[in-house]
Amino acid sequence: MTNSHISSLHSPHVERVKALLGPRGKKIRAVEKSFIADGIQSVREALHPRIELAPVVERLYLTDVGRERLIAGIDARLLDSVEISMVTDDVMNAMADTESPQGILALCTHLSLIHI
């Protein structure tokens, strides 16, 4: 688990998340085989795969409140291989696709059958 802090609205991380969620997001998600899980329930489900070809969580974007919510409900060992970026509320508001973000986003990648 590697931690970083993002406070700039012009960060490449912000731009990537916005691109995946934006109007051209469907095409970008298909090409990159990536998507954004938004909110506590979606992120928990991504971290607890129930199927063999479940998506892999590459990076978590968390506010302080989002971090507390997530850690309260999961086994911390699930985060060992995940990059974690702490973000300000302003950055989360810019990245999230909802009016009232929960402070938790995950960048996920679909596994390909070719790699198995």
Segments the model singles out, each with a brief description of its role:
Residues 45-46, 69-70, 94:
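Phosphate- and divalent-cation-binding pockets in alpha/beta enzyme and binding domains
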Residues 99:
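Glycine/small-residue-rich phosphate/adenosyl-binding loop
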Residues 80-96:
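A glycine-rich helix N-cap at a beta->alpha junction
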Residues 1-64:
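Boundary-proximal intrinsically disordered activation/regulatory segments immediately upstream
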Residues 106:
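Glycine-rich phosphate-binding loops that contact phosphosugars or nucleotide phosphates
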Residues 114-116:
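Conserved small/polar residues in nucleotide/adenosyl-binding loops
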